[in-house]
Amino acid sequence: MSTTENRGQFGSKLGFILSAAGSAVGLGNIWKFPGKACSRGEVHGRNLLAQSAAFLLVYIIMVALIGTTVMMAEFTVGRNAHKNALGSFRAISQKWGFAGGIGVLTGFIILCYYCQVGGWTMKYIYAYIAEAKMVYADPTAYFLGMLGANGFPLQGAVIFPLIFLFLTAFILSHGTAGIEKMSKVLMPLLFVLLIGLMIRSCTLPGADAGLKYMLNVDFSTINSNAILVALGQAFFSLSLGMGIMVTYASYLSDEDNLISNTGIVCVLDTLVALFAGFMIIPAVFATGIDPGMGGGFAFATLAGVFEAIPGGTLFGLLFYFLLFFAAVTSSTSIMEGTIAFLIEEKGLKRNHALLGTSVVVFIIGVFYTLSQVYMNIKGIWVSKNGIEYPIFGDFLEYLTDRLLLPLGALFSVICVGWVWSPEKSVEEATSHGRFKFSLAPVYKFMVKIVDPIAIGVIIIAGLVFGMSIS
């Protein structure tokens, strides 16, 4: 086992847990999870995807069975080698470094559009401070204007994403110490804002219908599609398949308890998703706003919700701060995977790696936003319907969500389960017997048999049926 000499290292268990939870808690927890929890059933006469409480239970089961075991596998790989994602898998077998390489590539591509959306959260913070009336006049038009409907989207594609990217790089310029300090500040603030907004939403007139929808279990609404969606959401929500958890665990000492750390991170991530559901769905019921869950939901749809509630401008401002905190804690972790790779595999200094990565991420990201409305930029995708030409932004999401993310995770669990062996993974998780792991037999079975099958199903659902796991 290599040492952590000359590498960053988390200074405390709390610092690692908050950093890993910050990575897992992203934009998808706050706006995509409530949308999927509200995707069948009926709100104001609108057919949705599954009765919410039943979906929540299925989601929690998927996190407990699939999410925790895949995360544990990634943690053990990273801590075993104390290297970047590619180097950690290569330490298991020279032939399997590509499993980590896929994760690094996936994270880099996601970072390109994640920093753009992070910039949008900053734009909306500014909007709610300086021009809330313009947002309320027509929330959809304001959102589309930010994307270029009224001319080149200087603020939406360049200025605010550039500020967000600079902030991400600045935090990472201080290494693991920067990540840890940021997480210790932003994660508690995120929970305070989330709980406060959840309480406000649940006390709105008419919110009781949303609460009933969230809490009334009807298993007859659960079908194979809902199970697949819950599985995909649980997988994506925990930042698996990007090499992030491998990289973060590589900054742990051999005395850290990976078993308890895995459980705590998964619980915190799930709590954020559940709290977000109780924050958004009751408000949707209370205001009668159409809960369309497309890409503009957090910006166009929820702006309409805030307009309709007392004190909406204040709560809207707090909500976009919440989104910003979630975005920046995730963007730093995603970028760190790339930076660690460039430092250790290519010999770059940290600041040089940050500069080069930021430039490329920014350029690609600009085209992501421009393709939404302003320019007709397309990619190419092959599906069961033949060759398609989605807009460039959708192409990037298809590439990561439907192919690279689950593919990287699949190779990761195959490597742990069949090349390295679950027994060695358990030995690493317990710090060579220092910690007790009573569920070790279950973990071994999951990582060797169940996890590869489940992830394979996600890949088939994405490539054949077009299901996006995020």
Give a label for each model feature.
Residues 13, 18-20, 58-94, 115, ...:
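Juxtamembrane transmembrane-helix boundary signature
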Residues 2-3, 40-46, 118-151, 251-255, ...:
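Helix-loop-helix connectors at the membrane interface of multi-pass transporters/channels
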Residues 102, 346-358, 397-455:
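C-terminal membrane-solvent junction of multi-pass transporters and transport-like membrane proteins
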Residues 4-7, 35-50, 80-102, 115-177, ...:
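Inter-helical loop and helix-membrane interface segments of multi-pass membrane transporters/permeases
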Residues 1-32, 70-75, 79-91, 97-98, ...:
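Membrane-interface "cap" regions at the ends of multi-pass membrane proteins
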Residues 12-60, 249, 259-263, 267-268, ...:
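Transmembrane helix-boundary motif of multi-pass solute transporters/channels
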Residues 2-10, 14, 180, 184-328, ...:
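Membrane-embedded translocation segments of transport machinery
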Residues 15, 157-158, 268-274, 313-316, ...:
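Loop-to-transmembrane helix boundary motifs in multi-pass membrane proteins
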